[in-house]
């Protein structure tokens, strides 16, 4: 059984027991989170596709940890001008474990 849901402006394909990183959610570690924007639920041959959402669809997950991703360097360089600008960025994330898929 798997499902596709939307969180943080992105779509994720998940199954029960899977751990994934989402954009930072404002919840405590160990708390339970419910995602209502379920786009598709598939259980073997039985597939429910939402228009745009699956009615009564819900994904339950447990927050494992919060953290920051790897550093991404941004470099701006102007040729022949002796000008260079460098900046770094680390994106916050929330790691969740999917505990249930309801349709």
From Swiss-Prot:
GO biological process assignments: translation
Alphabetized UniProt keyword annotations: Ribonucleoprotein, Ribosomal protein, RNA-binding, rRNA-binding
Keyword Ribonucleoprotein appears in the UniProt entry: yes
Pfam families, per the entry: Ribosomal_L21p
Database matches in InterPro entries: bL21-like, bL21-like_sf, Ribosomal_bL21, Ribosomal_bL21_CS
GO cellular component: cytoplasm; ribonucleoprotein complex; ribosome
Molecular function as annotated in GO: rRNA binding; structural constituent of ribosome
Family the UniProt entry places it in: Belongs to the bacterial ribosomal protein bL21 family.
Subunit architecture: Part of the 50S ribosomal subunit. Contacts protein L20.
Function: This protein binds to 23S rRNA in the presence of protein L20.
Name of the featured protein: Large ribosomal subunit protein bL21
Organism, as annotated: Vibrio parahaemolyticus serotype O3:K6 (strain RIMD 2210633)
Name of the encoding gene: rplU
